[in-house]
Amino acid sequence: MSLSSLLFYFVIIVPSAIIHEYAHGWMAERLGDPTARYAGRLTLDPRSHIDLWGTIVMPLFLFVVSGGSFMFAYAKPVPYNPYNLKNQKWGPAAVAVAGPLSNFLLAACFAALIRLMPVFPPSIWQLAPLFSIIVFANLLLMIFNLVPIPPLDGSKILFAILPDSMYKLRATLQQYLSLIHI
């Protein structure tokens, strides 16, 4: 992968990650928690979501170490207070689902544009490969975030589904799997 390819993927992944994080804050606010707004994070402004390590340093490091074959980036997680949510059991799951759902919707919109390409003038058709990469990147982000390992969104969905009697298991999984993530 060349430096231009790195920048190309970076320009696709970072906005998708920002929209993903914004969706978490948006859903939390809809469910009664204004924390993201108070923290200045209920915005699509990239400056509010860029994490020095996860958005800049780590992707560049991985790109260099892998010889240009691998890159991974993430945006700062949007804060929310689950105790402010109207529904304490399902609220955190709804906030968690909002991020991957935003990636799915982005992928669906760009897939629809690809499908509609024949309607547009041939000069527009050259955007199809770009749109395909956007679809692929967003589906990849969605699937990755649905993995049920803390702190990923899938774990919050799983924890909402687990019965309350499994609270100790949930707490243990959160504690130890979050350490593995770090």
What are these regions (language model features)?
Residues 1-180:
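Hydrophobic transmembrane alpha-helices and their immediate loop junctions
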